[in-house]
């Protein structure tokens, strides 16, 4: 038998032929389900496998594009389990060789070349050109005047590389000898994909003219251009050897450095550069002694900011430019993208189309991949760099973003695949498209088909679940490392584009990735979900249950190899699992509509959506500040040497925070619409936090008066505290001075604010002297937000959603301003501004406390300010006292007043304080009134708001790593405390006396119901029939296990046990479930073996897990096995294991009847209760635990062998009495009997 390439099949080829022959004979109806009946595939091309080292590179990229439009040889890797007629011993591992034929795809009994373009393709196609051939229908010539932009690209073109006959002279001039071209990607209202190439945009930077002339002896701008060109030509390497002074243009302008009030306008050289690469080199290396300004601003930002009104996401219109010049359509053969139409123009040919707000028919692709290890251990986690570890299926759902309609469902399968009829019926019943199942002989063919779909269909938006950290990196590593496929042509650009994933560091020890694809916006729903909602587990199934009230048919990773090897029908089960994952993610996408909020932020900040997703808060504020600074004649210095000048010294870092200070709320939290929740933050000091080095003082916290308060507590909040402080006090880089002589000519108090921060005197001039740039930004944004919110009630539902996302985007950016100034290594830090904000915040808290205590010390004074207070008097003495101050909140305990009355008059009280103490726009608002409040510590409290709603903040009661049993019991105790008036009264009496007193006296009778809950909890913990699922704890795997300093953690123990048992190990960021089990001989043996595995894993290279070591599998035994077992035969007593060593996988514990550690669980419950209720006992945790234990009878749980001996001797179990006296009588009788 011979292949088309000539020559007999090698032994490897015969195996591949067997694999293919089993694959090509369909076992039943194909997954498309409702198409024509399948038939035997015709014209099967037998694989010809050559040794790996002899492969010629696949025929691929032509001169004008770098995606594959033709291929006649490729590396063939396929699992041997597809050899369905082969004996079992021949079905292990993979075929790996080279095949000389075109890549094939099979669907519904039909066969096609993957790269062939023609009618009736297996997947939808939107690209006009393919492989340099125009496939547009006859007469296709769309007229484009209006188009929507969703992405902006930039690249450098060279005149000598272009066909001058195809370009107008003005475009050739813009790239002679080289020039930056901005490409706007978008869609027309009719759905045509458009690319508009904008010529003439230039990046630039500034240098002080006096310094340049002195250092370089320049007499004219041209001299500077010559000096820069010479420096570039002399640089290492050959990159800049052809640079001449014509690459630059310099002009003299007047500007002011944004730092410090005393800085005066000066002359600067503005140097225009034709490429970002040259700009970066000059700013980093040319005359380092001379400060550079705005050298890090990219060409896209310059394009947006230098053309007022331009946006990164919105509708544009083509119009005649200067001298009536028009945009030039490109001929198809000159297209640089996979668009339907392309234009060349300059910025003056563009205008914003303000009358349109709807989105065009953008396409959304939702995908998911399934992988399988192909080595000796099929249960190992697949590694992309291993050729034998394969992608076996890819589900791909295609939506219309404007209508949310699901238009296509595709399943790419390595090997034949028959989707279950039940799944097809379910999809049809839901009105969803029938899946098209695409089958492939090899992994390369499947991956090439998927990437060909990405190129030909070109979805503008892509989503999935954890695709940024897993799916995309795995696919791209496979394509580039194993198959050597260039990816730069698979985005919207046909070549020289970007399609890559890279690590961007760690956040809270989690490795994070970033993806950039030209013309494709990737929005990972995993990141959206973890940012928007708090759950105990972020697995897709848990998220679907919590958010969508839906769940999927789960398929264990351990089952995938067996299902895959079992044939087309069982592979269809994997396919159903893969498709339903994508369906759930699609539903989540349209539930949260993340593209609307992200695009609104992008518009406001002047950056594209990809930067909005991945580049953090800093760039958003920086770009807005850059725009405003240019309007006001300021320039922003680059980071290096920022604090030179203005006194000549770098500022001292403000002192670290004291114990009574805390870090301010993180950026992104809006003080006037804050959601309650969260825990304590670590004390502020100079430290590194997720890449942020902050060194300013935190906000002052007024120490809480701990206890159980049953009188009303009014909570006043400062609305948008930090933004309002910046506005009220005119704080900014440009209004700050570190020198007293700089403001000596001004009047203190009237013209400037003097304040001491961290032991240093700072001066900020008032707005009538120089208006703060930060204040202007905040004022404009807040006014815009107010206007948008006012439109929402009168809008249609669709428009209201869009407007709500816009106002939310403004809120996010507003709350980023304060944090922007406080990051020491940020884009434009000013720690003095950040420290001043928190200092003023502390002073405001103290001023409010003094005012309330003095102004309303007597009821008559309150009545004088608020006559309506006469109707809010309650029995008992009157007093008003602040019991807690928390960054931007003030808690006021009001005795002798009703909660209803305080709620009614609260806003008036807040306004009164605001007018008396603060400058506008700072204002207090009455946020809520607690009827009962358990105040535990800073940022830890539980209370019932007037109206009945309970609010819990910072308390273990709601921690997601507690088990369900402890959470339920804790919640029951809290409900009793707040909603049972008898218990509430007893608790209040308890809290009024010193805790030590209760050690010598009985607890109040009203706490009996409270104790009954604890007794019932103890009974349930010791019940042999308990449900283990109620006792499952979870902890997040925040980084690779080797990266943990403390290895003695419960969830790490379970991780290594799963590894040793060859089970699927969790991924980083997953929450690992575990239970704590009793210490037995089997557990001790497991711990010993696990220690060896940890040692082995610590020395394993890279991120690959160590080879598993077998763990003992205990015989099934009753769950009531005791917590501790006596050593047999009088042997030495074994070491008591750590709690972390007793952690076990819940599924394993259930399957093997492993006993729970009842002592641990009850101790843990008491620990949680002590943390919650210690405020009743003066915050003395030791006394709290001692008193709570009074409710629990002392019960000894003997080991099995001891219990058997006692029964044999005639002893019986005696339970506790209903009361302490009854128990005492029973014990007295027992001891008399024993005596």
Curated annotation (Swiss-Prot):
Reaction it catalyzes: DNA(n) + a 2'-deoxyribonucleoside 5'-triphosphate = DNA(n+1) + diphosphate; Endonucleolytic cleavage to 5'-phosphomonoester
Intracellular or extracellular location(s): Host nucleus
Alphabetized Pfam families for the sequence: DNA_pol_B, DNA_pol_B_exo1, DNAPolymera_Pol
Record key words, sorted: DNA replication, DNA-binding, DNA-directed DNA polymerase, Endonuclease, Host nucleus, Hydrolase, Multifunctional enzyme, Nuclease, Nucleotidyltransferase, Transferase, Viral DNA replication
GO CC terms of this entry: host cell nucleus
GO BP term (any one): viral DNA genome replication
Entry annotated with the keyword Nucleotidyltransferase: yes
Chain spans, region Disordered: 640-692, 1098-1134
Gene3D superfamilies: DNA polymerase family B, C-terminal domain (1.10.132.60), DNA Polymerase, chain B, domain 1 (3.30.342.10), Helix hairpin bin (1.10.287.690), Palm domain of DNA polymerase (3.90.1600.10), Ribonuclease H-like superfamily/Ribonuclease H (3.30.420.10)
Biased composition (Basic and acidic residues): 650-661, 676-691
Acidic residues composition bias: residue spans: 662-675
Recorded GO MF terms: DNA binding; DNA-directed DNA polymerase activity; nucleotide binding; RNA-DNA hybrid ribonuclease activity
SMART domains, per the entry: POLBc
EC number annotated for this UniProt entry: 2.7.7.7, 3.1.26.4
InterPro entries for the chain: DNA-dir_DNA_pol_B, DNA-dir_DNA_pol_B_CS, DNA-dir_DNA_pol_B_exonuc, DNA-dir_DNA_pol_B_multi_dom, DNA/RNA_pol_sf, DNA_pol_B_thumb, DNA_pol_palm_dom_sf, DNA_pol_type-B
Family per similarity comment: Belongs to the DNA polymerase type-B family.
Purpose: Replicates viral genomic DNA. The replication complex is composed of six viral proteins: the DNA polymerase, processivity factor, primase, primase-associated factor, helicase, and ssDNA-binding protein. Additionally, the polymerase contains an intrinsic ribonuclease H (RNase H) activity that specifically degrades RNA/DNA heteroduplexes or duplex DNA substrates in the 5' to 3' direction. Therefore, it can catalyze the excision of the RNA primers that initiate the synthesis of Okazaki fragments at a replication fork during viral DNA replication.
Assembly with partners or alone: Forms a complex with the ssDNA-binding protein UL29, the DNA polymerase processivity factor, and the alkaline exonuclease. Interacts with the putative helicase-primase complex subunit UL8; this interaction may coordinate leading and lagging strand DNA synthesis at the replication fork.
PANTHER family from the UniProt entry: DNA POLYMERASE CATALYTIC SUBUNIT (PTHR10322), DNA POLYMERASE DELTA CATALYTIC SUBUNIT (PTHR10322:SF23)
Protein name: DNA polymerase catalytic subunit
Organism, scientific name: Human herpesvirus 1 (strain Angelotti)
């Amino acid at each position: 038998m011979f292949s088309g390439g000539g020559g007999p099949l090698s032994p490897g080829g015969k195996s591949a032929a067997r694999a293919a022959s089993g694959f090509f004979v369909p076992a039943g109806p194909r997954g498309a389900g409702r198409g024509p009946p399948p038939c035997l595939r015709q014209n099967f091309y037998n694989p010809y496998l050559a040794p790996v080292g002899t492969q010629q590179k696949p025929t691929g990229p032509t001169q004008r594009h770098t995606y594959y439009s033709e291929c006649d040889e490729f590396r063939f890797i396929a699992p041997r389990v597809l050899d369905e007629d082969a004996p079992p011993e021949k079905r292990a591992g993979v075929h790996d060789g080279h095949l000389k034929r075109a890549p094939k795809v099979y669907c519904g009994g039909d066969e096609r070349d993957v790269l062939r373009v023609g009618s009736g393709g297996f997947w939808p196609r939107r690209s006009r050109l393919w492989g340099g051939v125009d496939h547009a229908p006859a007469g296709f010539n769309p007229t484009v005047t209006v188009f929507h932009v969703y992405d902006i690209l930039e690249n450098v073109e060279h005149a000598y590389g272009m066909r001058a006959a195809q370009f107008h002279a003005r475009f050739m001039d813009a790239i002679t000898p080289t020039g930056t071209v901005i490409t706007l990607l978008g869609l027309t209202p009719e759905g045509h994909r458009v690319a508009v190439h904008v010529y003439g945009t230039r990046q630039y930077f500034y240098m002080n003219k006096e310094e340049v002339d002195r250092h370089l002896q320049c007499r004219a701008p041209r001299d500077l251009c010559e000096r820069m060109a010479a420096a570039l030509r002399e640089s290492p390497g050959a990159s800049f050897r052809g640079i001449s002074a014509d690459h630059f243009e310099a002009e003299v302008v007047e500007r002011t450095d944004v730092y410090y009030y005393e800085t005066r306008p000066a002359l600067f050289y503005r140097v225009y550069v034709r490429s970002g690469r040259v700009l970066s080199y000059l700013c980093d290396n040319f005359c380092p002694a001379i400060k550079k300004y705005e050298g890090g601003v990219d060409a896209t930002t310059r394009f947006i900011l230098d053309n007022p009104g331009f946006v990164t996401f919105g509708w544009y219109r083509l119009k005649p430019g200067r001298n009536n010049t028009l945009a030039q359509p490109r001929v198809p053969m000159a297209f640089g993208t996979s668009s339907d139409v392309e234009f060349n123009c300059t910025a003056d040919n563009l205008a914003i189309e303000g009358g349109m707000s709807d989105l065009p028919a953008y396409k959304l692709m939702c995908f998911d991949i399934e992988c399988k290890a192909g080595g000796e251990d099929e249960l190992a986690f697949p590694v992309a760099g291993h050729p034998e570890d394969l992608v076996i299926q890819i589900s791909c759902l295609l939506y219309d973003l404007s209508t949310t309609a699901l238009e296509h469902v595709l399943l790419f399968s390595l090997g034949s695949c028959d989707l279950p009829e039940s799944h097809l019926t379910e999809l049809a019943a839901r009105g969803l498209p029938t899946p098209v199942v695409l089958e492939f002989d090899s992994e390369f063919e499947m991956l090439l088909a998927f990437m060909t779909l990405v190129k030909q269909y070109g979805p503008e938006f892509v989503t999935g679940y954890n695709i940024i950290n897993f799916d995309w990196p795995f696919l791209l590593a496979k394509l580039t490392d194993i198959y050597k496929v260039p990816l730069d042509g698979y985005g919207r650009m046909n070549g020289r584009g970007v399609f890559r994933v890279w690590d961007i560091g760690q956040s809270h020890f989690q490795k994070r990735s970033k993806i950039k694809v030209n013309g494709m916006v990737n929005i990972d729903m995993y990141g959206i979900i973890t940012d928007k909602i708090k759950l105990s587990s972020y697995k897709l199934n848990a998220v679907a249950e919590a958010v969508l009230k839906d769940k999927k048919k789960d398929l264990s990773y351990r089952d995938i190899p067996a299902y895959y090897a079992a044939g087309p029908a069982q592979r269809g089960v994997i396919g159903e699992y893969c498709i339903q994952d994508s369906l759930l993610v699609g539903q989540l996408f349209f539930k949260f509509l993340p593209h609307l909020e992200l695009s609104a932020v992008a518009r406001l900040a002047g950056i594209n959506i990809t930067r909005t997703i991945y580049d953090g808060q800093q760039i958003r504020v920086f770009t807005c500040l850059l725009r405003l600074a240019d309007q006001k004649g300021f320039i922003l210095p680059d980071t290096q040497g920022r604090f030179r000048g203005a006194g000549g010294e770098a500022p001292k870092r403000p002192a670290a925070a004291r114990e009574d200070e805390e870090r301010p709320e993180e950026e992104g939290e809006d003080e006037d619409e804050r959601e309650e929740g969260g825990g304590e933050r670590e004390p502020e000091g100079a430290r590194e936090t997720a890449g942020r080095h902050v060194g300013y003082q935190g906000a002052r916290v007024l120490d809480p008066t701990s206890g159980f308060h049953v009188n009303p507590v009014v909570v006043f909040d400062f609305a948008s505290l930090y933004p309002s402080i910046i506005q009220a006090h005119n704080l900014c880089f440009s209004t700050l001075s570190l020198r007293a002589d700089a403001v000596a000519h001004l009047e203190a108090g009237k013209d400037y604010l003097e304040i001491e921060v961290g032991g240093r005197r700072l001066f900020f001039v008032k707005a009538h002297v120089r208006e703060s740039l930060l204040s202007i930004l905040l004022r404009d944004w807040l006014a815009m937000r107010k206007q948008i919110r006012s439109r929402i009630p009168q809008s249609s539902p669709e428009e209201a959603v869009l407007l709500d996302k816009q106002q939310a985007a403004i809120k996010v950016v507003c709350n980023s301003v304060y944090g922007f100034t406080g990051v020491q290594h940020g884009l434009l830090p000013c720690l003095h501004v950040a420290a001043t904000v928190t200092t003023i915040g502390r002073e405001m808290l103290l001023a409010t406390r003094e005012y309330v205590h003095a102004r309303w010390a007597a009821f008559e004074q309150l009545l004088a300010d608020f006559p309506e207070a006469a109707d809010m008097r309650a029995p008992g003495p009157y007093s008003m006292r602040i019991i807690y101050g928390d960054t931007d909140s003030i808690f006021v305990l009001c005795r002798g007043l009703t909660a209803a009355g305080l709620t009614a008059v609260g806003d008036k009280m807040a306004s009164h304080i605001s007018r008396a103490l603060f400058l506008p726009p700072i204002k207090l608002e009455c946020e809520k009134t607690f009827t009962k409040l358990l105040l535990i510590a800073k940022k830890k409290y539980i209370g019932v708001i007037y109206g009945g709603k309970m609010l819990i903040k910072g308390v273990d009661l709601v921690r997601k790593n507690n088990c369900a049993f402890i959470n339920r019991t804790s919640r029951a105790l809290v409900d009793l405390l707040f909603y049972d008036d008898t218990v509430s009264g007893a608790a209040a009496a308890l809290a009024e006396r010193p805790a030590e007193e209760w050690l010598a006296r009985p607890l109040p009778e009203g706490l009996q119901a409270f104790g009954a809950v604890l007794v019932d909890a103890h009974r349930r913990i010791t019940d042999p029939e308990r449900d283990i699922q109620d006792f499952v704890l979870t902890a997040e795997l925040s980084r690779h296990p080797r990266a943990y300093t403390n290895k003695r953690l419960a969830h790490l123990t379970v991780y290594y046990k799963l590894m040793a048992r060859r089970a699927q190990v969790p991924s980083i960021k997953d929450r690992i479930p575990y239970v704590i089990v009793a210490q037995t001989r089997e557990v001790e043996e497991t711990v010993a073996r696990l220690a060896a595995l940890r040692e082995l894993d610590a020395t394993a290279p890279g991120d690959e897990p160590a080879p598993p070591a077998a763990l003992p599998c205990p015989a099934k035994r009753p769950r009531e096995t005791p917590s501790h077992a006596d050593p047999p035969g009088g042997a030495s007593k074994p070491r008591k294991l750590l709690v972390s060593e007793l952690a076990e996988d819940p599924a394993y514990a259930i399957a093997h009847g492993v006993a729970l550690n009842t002592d641990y669980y009850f101790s843990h419950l008491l620990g949680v209760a002590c943390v919650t209720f210690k405020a009743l006992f003066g915050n003395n945790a030791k006394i709290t635990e001692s008193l709570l234990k009074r409710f629990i009878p002392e019960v000894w749980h003997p080991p099995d062998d001891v219990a058997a001996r006692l029964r044999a001797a005639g002893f019986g179990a005696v339970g506790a009495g209903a009361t302490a006296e009854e128990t005492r009588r029973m014990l007295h009788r027992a001891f008399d009997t024993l005596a």
